[in-house]
C-alpha cells in the first residue's frame, strides 16, 4: 500500500530540481575540465576525448542548413587513433586560427574519419575536436519546469495531479481489440492505460514485455483516432519503440538528429522524409543557386563590377535561402500533421511541433529519466502513460550531492510510491530470464 504524501508546492519542487541540475552540470563540467587541464593535447588525444590535427575533406548540407563535415587526420588519413566519440556525442570544434569553438554533434564514425554536424561553417585549416558536456538538455529541462510552474489549462491540471494536488481519473476500461497476442496481465494493463483520463503507469520486472504492452497501447489509441507522442530517455529505446510501431503499420515520424538514430529506422526520421518530399528538388535548386550567387559576390575580378552588383547578389542569395526555408517548413508541417505517432527522446527540442497537442504521451523506460526530462514532452499532451521498472537502477547521476538530495528519484518512482495501485498495473509473466534469477528478482524486489 502506497503512503500518501502532502501536496508539493510547485515553486519549491521545481526550485529543488533547478538547484540539483546546477550541481549535476557543475559535476560534469569539473570532470571534463579536470581531464582537460591535467592532460597535454597529446595525452588528451590518447585518453580518447580529443582528436587533433583534423582537416575537412568533404562536406554536405543537411536539414535546416546544417553543415555535415567529414574530418580526417591531416598526416594519417588512413586511420583515426582510438577514441570515445560515438554517433550523437556533443562536441566542440576549434582551430588554431579561431579559438572560439563551435558546438556540433558526431553524425557518423568510420575507421578513417568522423562526420560532425554544425550550424556554422568553421574558419581554419586544421581543427581540434573535443567531447563536451550536454548543457542543451539541462536548458530544455529548466525551460520545461518554468512552463509547468506557471502553466494554465491542461498542463496546469497535469502539474497539479503529478504534484499530488488532485487524484487521477479513470473511465470504463475498454476491451482491447486484436490483442490476442498479449497475456492476461498485459491486456489488463492496456485496458487500464486506455481508460486513464490523465495518468497511468505500467511496471514490471525485466522480460515481462513492457515495450510490447506500450506498443499495443499506442496501436489501440491510434485505432481510436488519437495522436500519440511516444518517448523514451535514450535514442536506442526510442528506436526500439519506433521499429515495433512501424511493424504495426502506424504512420510514425522520428524526431531527432539522424546521427543519433539507428540505421534500420533512419528512413522514418523527419530529415529523411523531408529529403523524399516533393518539394525537396525545388529547395535544393534554390540553395544551389544561392551558393553560386554568394561565390560570385566574393570572387575577385580584374574588371570593376557594376555599382551595387555584389550587394545585389548577396541580397538575392539571402532571399533564395529564405524561400527555401519557407518551403522546407511547409514540408515539415505537412509531414508532422500526417503522422499518427511522433517519436523522440524526452529531451528533444519539441519547438518543431509549435502549438501541436497530442491526445496521449507514452514514456517507455521512464525510470531511466530524471524527472525534469519528463516535463519537456508533458507540455504538449492531454494525458500520460509511464512504463518502466522502478525496482531497477535509477537514472545515472554524476553529482553525489544532487543524487543524495533527490535528483536520482524518477517521476515514475515518485508517483508509484505516492499513488500505488490507484495508477499502476504490473506485468507478471516473464518471457526472458533464467528461472532462478527470475525467482530471486520476484522475491526480493516485487513482493513475490
What are these regions (language model features)?
Residues 3-16, 78-191, 247, 265-288, ...:
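Pre-ATPase regulatory/linker segments immediately N-terminal to the P-loop/RecA-like helicase/translocase core
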Residues 185, 196-202, 225-226, 340, ...:
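Pre-Walker A (Motif I) flank of P-loop NTPase domains
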Residues 224-226, 234, 248, 347-448:
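Conserved helicase motor core of SF1/SF2 NTP-dependent helicases
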Residues 213, 217, 237:
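Hydrophobic positions on the alpha1 helix immediately C-terminal to the Walker A/P-loop
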Residues 209:
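Conserved glycine(s) of the Walker
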Residues 173-174, 219, 227, 231, ...:
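Conserved P-loop NTPase motor core of helicases/translocases
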Residues 204, 257, 365:
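The Walker A (P-loop) glycine that initiates the GxxxxGKT/S ATP-binding motif of P-loop NTPases
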Residues 1-86:
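A helicase ATPase "motif cassette" and its flanking acidic/Ser/Thr-rich regulatory loops
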